[in-house]
Amino acid sequence: MTQQLSNTNRVALLLQPYLTTQDLMAWYGRGKSWVGAKLREMHTALIKEGKKVLRGTISTAAFMRFEGIDLDEYVAKAKIEKELGI
């Protein structure tokens, strides 16, 4: 199991146009097999919507939609971490 990211690092990932398998492994703090299954699940949903997918990646916008992520929430958490020196 890999170490999970700080909110500051999560914000940096969410500002990228695409997330790779390695990015998702860091995000979830899980291994390649688990992340691969999660990515296949998201790809299947995207294909059903008529979208094209690229193996081993997902657009950050699609990832945020699937996970219900609000970028502003992570930015606020990152600011708090910075103030607390975490």
Name every feature range the model reports, one short phrase each:
Residues 28-85:
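Major-groove DNA-recognition helix of helix-turn-helix-type DNA-binding domains
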Residues 1-16, 47-50:
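Short helix->loop/beta-hairpin flanking segments within DNA-binding domains
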Residues 3-7, 77, 86:
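Short recognition helix of helix-turn-helix/winged-helix DNA-binding domains
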Residues 11-34:
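Polyanion-binding surface elements
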Residues 1-2, 21, 39-40:
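A short alpha-helix capping/helix-coil boundary motif
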